Design a protein with these regions (language model features):
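Conserved Walker A/P-loop ATP-binding site and its immediately adjacent core
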Residues: 7-31, 50
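Motif I (Walker A/P-loop) of helicase-class P-loop NTPases
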Residues: 1-5, 108
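Conserved interdomain linker/interface between the two RecA-like ATPase lobes of SF2 helicase motors
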Residues: 105, 110-191
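Flexible beta-alpha connector loops of hexameric P-loop NTPases
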Residues: 39-48, 90-102, 163-171
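Post-Walker A helix-loop "phosphate-sensing" segment adjacent to the P-loop in P-loop NTPases
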Residues: 7-14, 36-38, 140-142
Length: 191
């Protein structure tokens, strides 16, 4: 939110992508409390009239922030400063069920390349392997959040060599995972 605030102070605009349309009401509510009414909403569930009205507000410069699903990436914002992609790991950012097919993350990266000085933030507690590998190669800048929002400890992570597991057992799960699942179920906990 602070980076968005900084962008607006510099008279730049922002796009915030969420993976699902169902997440837009709570996102709009949160942003409206902080940034007021200069926010537009774009997604495929809007009526043609609603979509037209939002595009017109954006085109007139009445909007600083566009929030929506992947199609919001095409908003005609002027002076773009930042694109935030929440839950970057979500498959919802890939449009592959109809033409034109595109990956919203790749499109966002291309859009900021065309808008000199603009930035992309890929937010995720569980980034894709591709994004994580790019961060390790310093193509992306990785920011670790060592503390969860709710102050709960981070989960313990165990790497299992599945090549070895496939030699030992049949099936698609490691013995360690199967044992942990059995342990949780025996305590009537969710898995």
């Amino acid at each position: 939110m602070e980076l968005i605030e900084d962008c607006i102070k510099e008279n730049k605009t922002c796009i915030v992508l969420v993976p699902e349309i169902s997440l837009t009401p709570q996102t709009i509510s949160r942003f409206s409390k902080r940034f007021g009414s200069r926010i537009a909403l774009l997604h495929s569930a809007l009526s043609d009239g609603e979509r037209y009205d939002e595009w017109r507000r954006i085109n007139r410069g009445e909007v600083d922030i566009v929030i929506g699903a992947r199609s919001a990436l095409f908003a005609p914002l002027k002076n773009l400063g930042l694109i935030v992609i929440d839950e970057q790991h979500s498959e919802s950012y890939k449009q592959d069920d109809s033409n034109p097919r595109y990956d919203a993350i790749n499109m966002a990266i291309k859009r900021v390349e065309l808008n000199k000085g603009a930035k992309v933030i890929l937010g995720s507690a569980t980034p894709t392997l591709d994004a994580y590998a790019r961060a390790l190669k310093n193509i992306y800048h990785l920011l670790n959040l060592p503390i969860r929002v709710n102050k709960k400890p981070l989960p313990e992570v165990t790497l299992v060599d599945m090549n070895q597991e496939f030699k030992r057992s049949e099936g698609h799960f490691s013995l360690l995972l199967l044992n942990k699942i059995k342990e949780k179920l025996s305590k009537e906990e969710q898995v």
